Amino acid sequence: MAEFNALELVNPGVKQLRPYQAGKPTSELQRELGLQHVVKLASNENPLGLSEKVKTALEAELTDLVRYPDANGYYLKSRLAELNEVGTQQITLGNGSNDVLEILARTFVSDKDEVIFSQHAFVVYPLVTQAIGAKPVAVPAVDYGHDLDGMAKAVTDKTKMIFIANPNNPTGTFLSTSALKSFLDKIPQHIIVVLDEAYYEYVPEDQRAPSVEWIKEYPNLVVSRTFSKAYGLAGLRAGYAVSHESVADVLNRIRQPFNMNSLSLKAAEVVLDDHAYLQKAVELNAQGMQLLTEFCEESGLNYIPSYGNFLTIEVGPGAEKLYDELLHEGVIVRPVGGYELPNHLRVSIGLPEENQAFIKAMKKLRG
């Protein structure tokens, strides 16, 4: 009897996929190298830790965990609708924004379609595209960011969805309001445009696009956001999309009824009103960003100016080697060769002492 091989049974798109490589956990490095103290600057998490208000709310929630969560997420959706000045029927909740991106692809894209995104953009875009069997169309980047003119020209009669990350991960590049608006004007309404704003809160308020307001004018626009970054809930998995109500209606037909658990629903609801926590997170990020960019400039290292909570630094052909050497110094960063950036490392902004640990290790290793 021939040996069973599940790979022979899957759809063609899945055959080409490789498992997503997340940032290395601190516990894994401690086990591997026997290190006591490890600094993780690999996954763009909030270094402040959990909001104290969230901690208190979660403790009160523990007694009810034998019950299923609210499948509709009424209270969280109501709060999000209020903040975004939309109806609750325009909100789709996700188990992190990755879940939202997958729901969008499964809802609108078939194996006969094409999906457009930028080179150096978030790896989940090609992942969800190929999983369906659709054709991924990666448009070459300009200055490490989206070439919106090139993306508009890449549209064909097979295009069904376009992903735009603003700010972009892993490069941190940012698209202006006028550039985005001009792009949306060029895209026909039968193509869904997903504006992934995972790092929205780190963008200065006077530079943020009124993306949710645009949905009235562009009903094919979907705005995706997450609680994993500035709101500090990466481990609880909470995200959402705002869209035209007819789009949200079909998304919620695909969405699993309990895709957000009770703790993530409560945490997301509470942290939205912890304004002091969010402000502190944004200020801490700005200070850390300044420290790292100054270090790069003093060290003669090129970097990509970033609007996120990370900095992608050009370290040369030995990027993978330097990554391994940093691991032995107890510092975890992110190699981005998989994003066609083999000479770069992405460094998350941490606490002041964590940023200093990275700088100290870099000075030791690079002389």
From Swiss-Prot:
- Top-rank EC class of the record's enzyme: transferase
**Its Gene Ontology biological processes?**
L-histidine biosynthetic process
Reaction(s) catalysed by this chain's protein: L-histidinol phosphate + 2-oxoglutarate = 3-(imidazol-4-yl)-2-oxopropyl phosphate + L-glutamate
Reply yes or no: does the keyword Transport apply: no
* EC numbers on record: 2.6.1.9
SUPFAM superfamilies named among the record's database cross-references:
PLP-dependent transferases
Name the PROSITE patterns on file: AA_TRANSFER_CLASS_2
Please list the GO terms describing molecular function.
Answer: histidinol-phosphate transaminase activity; pyridoxal phosphate binding
Q: Cross-referenced Pfam families, in alphabetical order?
A: Aminotran_1_2 (PF00155)
Keywords, A to Z, come to: Amino-acid biosynthesis, Aminotransferase, Histidine biosynthesis, Pyridoxal phosphate, Transferase
Its cofactor is:
pyridoxal 5'-phosphate
State the pathway, as annotated in the record. Answer: Amino-acid biosynthesis; L-histidine biosynthesis; L-histidine from 5-phospho-alpha-D-ribose 1-diphosphate: step 7/9
InterPro entries, sorted: Aminotrans_II_pyridoxalP_BS, Aminotransferase_I/II_large, HisP_aminotrans, HistidinolP_aminotransfase, PyrdxlP-dep_Trfase, PyrdxlP-dep_Trfase_major, PyrdxlP-dep_Trfase_small
What CDD domains does the entry give?
A: AAT_like
Q: Which residues carry this modification: N6-(pyridoxal phosphate)lysine?
A: 229
Q: Belongs to which family? A: Belongs to the class-II pyridoxal-phosphate-dependent aminotransferase family. Histidinol-phosphate aminotransferase subfamily.
Q: Subunit info?
A: Homodimer.
Q: What's the name of the protein?
A: Histidinol-phosphate aminotransferase 1
Q: Which organism is it from?
A: Idiomarina loihiensis (strain ATCC BAA-735 / DSM 15497 / L2-TR)
